[in-house]
């Protein structure tokens, strides 16, 4: 972690080579939704091993431009040029933020608000917040494999509407929420720390983007008035940012974070363990668990994951 954050005094991207990467077009660096990428229409083919013949696929389609998300009363979308990142990359680089503003916000008021920073992968806009009642049917035939239920879309919409009602209620605390868009030429987020490979994203977010948002929406603008949270990759980012900028933030809630320490990378100590797939044993080979089901039962081992990851890599994942 420390190695990733503390950039070595190497050359910047602007000083090394000329890199050609697709620029951000509103898709969060997702190739399958990136405007101007081309693709074919789906076709049905028959495979006959006794009579093999070439299959003709015509590239006729192009992904259209993405319309910017419109601001609303409560949700705003901010974009700034980062001088720190632009210097590192040798071209104009930008950071964006989705901002949820509190009920009763008045720019001309002297009221100042604390800031909640939600970390994670690319968010197109503030999710889980809607100002209208749910329109999805309570009962449908769409089964959610993840949660084992139907009607999940209704549940999502209802929770989002309930959050709106809570957010605007009389006694609910007033604060700002920010989601950061820090997609880059390599991925849909930067992991929110400084990196010799990606540049000073940690500094750019902490010292350029967040103060800009706070100035625009009457934030407190001091470390004691900022809190970090996130899950999975966002959990890792929340903990990393709090670790590297202890005076700029006042706490972090890291839910199910990506591995924080390579001494406990899932069930492997990368630094010391000789075998990633089995525990050391004098008697029999004991597989290292890799995944448990909702009851806590092991349903996949590290060895099982080896084949899954290998296949995924071959597919270009």
Predicted regions and their residues:
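Non-catalytic cap/lid and distal C-terminal segments of serine-dependent acyl enzymes
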Residues: 1-317
């Amino acid at each position: 972690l420390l190695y990733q954050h503390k950039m070595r005094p190497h050359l910047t991207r602007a000083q090394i080579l000329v890199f050609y990467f697709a620029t951000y077009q509103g898709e969060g660096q997702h190739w399958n939704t990136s405007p101007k990428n081309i693709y074919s229409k789906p076709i049905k083919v028959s495979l006959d091993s006794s009579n093999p013949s070439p299959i003709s696929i015509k590239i006729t389609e192009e992904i259209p431009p993405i319309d910017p998300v419109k601001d609303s009363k409560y949700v705003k979308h901010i974009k700034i040029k980062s001088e720190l990142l632009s210097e590192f990359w040798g071209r104009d680089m930008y950071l964006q933020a989705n901002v949820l503003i509190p009920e009763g916000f008045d720019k001309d008021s002297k009221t100042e608000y604390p800031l909640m920073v939600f970390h994670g992968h690319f968010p197109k806009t503030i999710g889980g917040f809607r100002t209208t009642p749910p329109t999805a049917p309570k009962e449908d035939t769409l089964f959610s494999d993840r949660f084992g239920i139907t009607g999940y879309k209704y549940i999502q919409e209802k929770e989002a509407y309930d959050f709106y009602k809570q957010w605007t209620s009389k006694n609910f605390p007033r604060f700002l929420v920010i989601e950061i868009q820090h997609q880059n030429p390599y991925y849909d987020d930067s992991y929110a720390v400084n990196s010799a490979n990606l540049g000073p994203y940690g500094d750019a977010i902490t010292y350029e983007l967040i103060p800009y948002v706070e100035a625009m929406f009457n934030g407190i603008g001091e470390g004691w008035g900022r809190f970090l949270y996130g899950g999975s990759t966002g959990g890792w980012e929340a903990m990393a940012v709090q670790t590297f900028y202890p005076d700029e933030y006042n706490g972090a809630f890291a839910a199910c974070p990506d591995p924080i320490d390579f001494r406990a990378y899932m069930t492997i100590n990368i630094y010391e363990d000789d075998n990633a797939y089995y525990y050391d044993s004098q008697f029999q080979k004991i597989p290292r668990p890799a995944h448990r089901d909702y009851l806590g039962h092991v349903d996949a081992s590290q060895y099982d994951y080896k084949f899954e990851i290998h296949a995924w890599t071959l597919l270009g994942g």
